[in-house]
Amino acid sequence: MKNHLFFWGVLAIFVQAVLVTAGDEGERIVLADNKCKCVRVTSRIIPSPENPNEDILERHIRIIIPVNSRENISDPTSPVRTKFVYHLSDLCKKCDPVEVELDNQVVTASQSNICDEDSETCYAYDRNKCYTNRVPLTYGGQTKIVETALTPDSCYPD
C-alpha cells in the first residue's frame, strides 16, 4: 500500500513539473530562428526579482557552433571555419513582404529597412536548400567531373 501511494505521489510531482516546464516554454516569443547561422533568439516577460510590480524582458540567445563547418560549406575541401560572426540586428530582421492595411488601402511592406540581396554566410546547411558540388569520379580508369548533391533530401523529390 505504501508503494502504491509513493508511486502516485511521484507521478503527481512529475506531471506538475512537466506542466510547469511546458507553460514556461509557451510564453516565449521567437524573435529569430536562423538555421543558416544556427541561432535561435527568444524573449519573454517575467516579474522583476527586485520589484514584483514591474516586469522585465528576458532574452534567450542560443548559438550552436558547428565545429567542423567549412569556410565554403559547398566545398568539402575548403579549410575549417575558425571565425563566426553574429549581428543581432541581422538575425532579427524580417525581410519577407507583409500586407498591411493603411487608411483602407492594402500595402505591401517589409518589417526591416536593412534588407539587401547579399546572400548571408551560412555556417550550416539549410536542409530546405539544395547544395551541390562538382567532384572528380574515377570509374573504369576514366576520371570525370560530376555534380553531386551534398544535401540529397532537399535536392531530389520523393
Curated annotation (Swiss-Prot):
The keyword Phosphoprotein does not apply. Residues 1-22 form the signal peptide. It is found in: Secreted. It comes from the Eukaryota. GO terms for cellular component: pentameric IgM immunoglobulin complex. InterPro entries: Ig_J. GO terms for molecular function: immunoglobulin receptor binding. Disulfide bonds join 36-122, 95-115, 130-155. N-glycosylated. N-glycans attached to Asn-72 varies from truncated, differentially fucosylated to sialylated (NeuGc) complex types: Man3GlcNAc2; GlcNAc2Man3GlcNAc2(Fuc); Gal1GlcNAc1Man3GlcNAc2; GlcNAc2Man3GlcNAc2; GlcNAc1Man3GlcNAc2; GlcNAc1Man2GlcNAc2 and NeuGc1Gal1GlcNAc2Man3GlcNAc2. GO terms for biological process: humoral immune response. Keywords: Disulfide bond, Glycoprotein, Secreted, Signal. Its main location: secreted. It holds the Pfam family Ig_J_chain. Glycans are attached at residue 72. Serves to link two monomer units of either IgM or IgA. In the case of IgM, the J chain-joined dimer is a nucleating unit for the IgM pentamer, and in the case of IgA it induces dimers and/or larger polymers. It also helps to bind these immunoglobulins to secretory component. PANTHER family: IMMUNOGLOBULIN J CHAIN. Part of the secretory IgA (sIgA) complex that consists of two, four or five IgA monomers, and two additional non-Ig polypeptides, namely the JCHAIN and the secretory component (the proteolytic product of PIGR). Part of the secretory IgM (sIgM) complex that consist of five IgM monomers, and two additional non-Ig polypeptides, namely the JCHAIN and the secretory component (the proteolytic product of PIGR). JCHAIN-containing IgM interacts (via CH4 domain) with FCRM (via Ig-like domain). This is Immunoglobulin J chain. It comes from Equus asinus (Donkey). The lineage of its organism: Eukaryota, Metazoa, Chordata, Craniata, Vertebrata. The gene is JCHAIN.
